[in-house]
Amino acid sequence: YDAIIVVTYLYYPAVKSIVRVKDKAIFIPTAHQEPFIHFKMYEEVFEAPKAYVFLTDEEKDLVQSLFHIEEKPYEVMGVGVTVPDNVDPDAFKKKYNLDNYIIYVGRIDEGKDCPRLFQYFMEYKKRVKSDLKLVLMGKAVVEVPQHEDIISLGFVSDEDKFNGIKGAKALILPSKFESLSISVLEAMTLSIPVVVNGICDVLRGHCVKSNGGLYYKNYFEFEGCLRFLHEHPEEYKQMCLNARKYVDDYFQWDDIMAKFDRIIEKVGE
């Protein structure tokens, strides 16, 4: 092989393989700020590969700040996302008797900061007169509060997922630790703004670079995000356009594969 692509720094296959194939290794670490990346054992892992592929600028900055890899070639690219051509939000709303809602898509657990999302949303419902609901899609591994405005659908079909995202006021992602987030890119591809945890550099970066999302770091900023979406309709329309443009500009497969070709050529030289 001219090059061997190793994906995700955290697990055994990457840790053991990359030091053996380092002269041919292209490393896609999918790294984010978390305790594990600071373990001393990872110094050898991150300094081994010939080249890097980062999913975002924020990931690149993090890895370069932690390890001595300044001289290694790299490319920054995301991933492309594919959504159906025909999406029917009205069918989703009719099926589940929903109208005004925000949506969370993914594993419902503490690692994604879902308990804090529930806390913030219930506080919002106490403080703000609104018919807004929170719709959850995915496996719940933490308890979902019994609340009339929190709707947990469990696993759903791809059709329901995309219809549901398209019908939402926004997709919300409360996670503090993300290296990219496919669900955020899927929502933006469907011209749906996102509301994310601003503690996560990558998610905050999506919002800042696109002007297609909002971020929060505490309850009052969370409330402010939801109020803004509902109280500024013209700005909301522009956010929808901005979200789609961001994906079109930076997350297209043709561009991504061209970057892959370049980095593979560098490793093979």
Task: List each language-model region with its residue ranges.
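Nucleotide-activated donor-binding/catalytic signature segment of Leloir-type glycosyltransferases, i.e.
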Residues: G138-N163, G167-A170
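Conserved donor-binding/catalytic core segment of Leloir-type glycosyltransferases
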Residues: V53, K93-K112, F118-M122, C240
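Aromatic "clamp/platform" in nucleotide-sugar-dependent glycosyltransferases that forms part
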Residues: K176
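Short hydrophobic beta-strand element within catalytic cores of glycosyltransferases
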Residues: P193-N197
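A short, well-ordered alpha-helix in the C-terminal region of glycosyltransferases
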Residues: H206, F228, E235-D249, K259-R262
